[in-house]
UniProtKB/Swiss-Prot annotation:
Entry similarity comment: Belongs to the inositol monophosphatase superfamily.
GO cellular component: cytoplasm
Residue ranges of the TM segments: none
Pathway entry: Polyol metabolism; myo-inositol biosynthesis; myo-inositol from D-glucose 6-phosphate: step 2/2
Catalytic activity: a myo-inositol phosphate + H2O = myo-inositol + phosphate; 1D-myo-inositol 1-phosphate + H2O = myo-inositol + phosphate; 1D-myo-inositol 2-phosphate + H2O = myo-inositol + phosphate; 1D-myo-inositol 3-phosphate + H2O = myo-inositol + phosphate
Subunit organization: Homodimer.
Keyword flag Metal-binding: yes
Main location as per UniProt: cytoplasm
Taxonomic lineage from the root: Eukaryota, Metazoa, Chordata, Craniata, Vertebrata
Protein name: Inositol monophosphatase 2
């Protein structure tokens, strides 16, 4: 369902120093969604980045250029971390300055194949603290938002995570990541097997980490884990999950490190710890060391 003008008005209201930034992010996410929906049905020029499974299209670049250029006009002193700029050699460093963390199309492989699970993700951090996140599920026109201390919403409806604590009653989401060498695939499949041996109801892969995390925030899944995601996949969704009452931690069980390329998220701390304890680590390095 497309957000109504009334709902959009509700979403941009708030009391805080970053209200204008949040409002602009919402409008840009909606504009980006229009571009992505139109391009979804068209022919695409596809390139690869780190592997044959790590894809990029002209639309990724077009959407990122739109978002970054508009934000630079409005907020010239702010910093940016954006997926395609980073792939082209820009440094991925989170400082204390106001910083936008952008994934123009999360689910590019889905986008290429016209599989309708595709999103644009815009996160915002100040003093290395995540302030808000905006994620637009382009094909279903669902707008997920979260602001620190102000709750999380989808098209104006408040989100609430699942309160499940029993892994044997859990639906768990994950993503494969771009590395497909035999050792990485062996550990990936082993981690799924461990959760299934623990009698989890199921393990799902949908091709978009940001939307999987939004489904967790909505209570449609109980946990999420991944090795190989990046800060632009995680920033906006982390705020949304936390504001929906959920937990986001490192796969070691410690506090989340946005640059570590790994995460466990769940509706409850008990569930997050159970997942973290079951996992074998896959090393993807760090975003701020690439």
């Amino acid at each position: 369902m497309k957000p109504s003008s009334e709902e959009e008005g509700e979403l941009v209201q708030g009391v805080g120093p970053w209200d204008e930034c949040f409002e602009v992010a919402v409008q840009l996410a909606l504009r980006a969604g229009q571009i992505i929906r139109k391009a979804l049905t068209e022919e695409k020029r596809v390139s690869t980045k780190t592997s044959a499974a790590d894809l990029v299209t002209e639309t990724d670049h077009r959407v990122e250029d739109l978002i970054v250029s508009e934000l630079r006009k409005r907020f010239p002193s702010h910093r940016f971390i954006a997926e395609e700029a980073t792939a082209s050699g820009a440094k991925c460093v989170l400082t204390h300055s106001p910083t936008w963390i952008i994934d123009p199309i999360d689910g590019t492989c889905n986008f290429v194949h016209r599989f309708p699970t595709v999103a644009v993700s815009i996160g915002f951090a100040v003093h290395q603290e995540l302030e808000f996140g905006v994620i637009h599920h382009c094909t279903e026109e669902r707008l997920y938002t979260g602001r620190r201390g102000q709750g999380a919403f989808c098209n104006g409806q408040r989100l609430q995570v699942s309160r499940e604590t029993d892994l044997a009653k859990a639906l768990v989401l994950t993503e494969i990541g771009p590395k497909r060498d035999p050792d990485t695939l062996k550990v990936f499949l082993s981690n799924m097997e461990r959760l299934l041996h623990a009698k989890a109801h199921g393990v799902r892969v949908i091709g978009s980490s940001t939307l999987a995390l939004c489904y967790l925030a909505s209570g449609a899944a109980d946990a999420y884990y991944q090795f190989g995601l990046h800060c632009w996949d995680l920033a906006a969704a982390t705020v949304i999950i936390r504001e929906a009452g959920g937990i986001v931690i490192d796969t070691s069980g410690g506090p989340l490190d946005l640059m570590s390329c790994r995460v466990v998220a769940a509706g409850t701390r008990e569930m997050a710890v159970l997942i973290a304890q079951a996992l074998q680590t896959i090393n993807y390095g760090r975003d701020d060391e690439k």
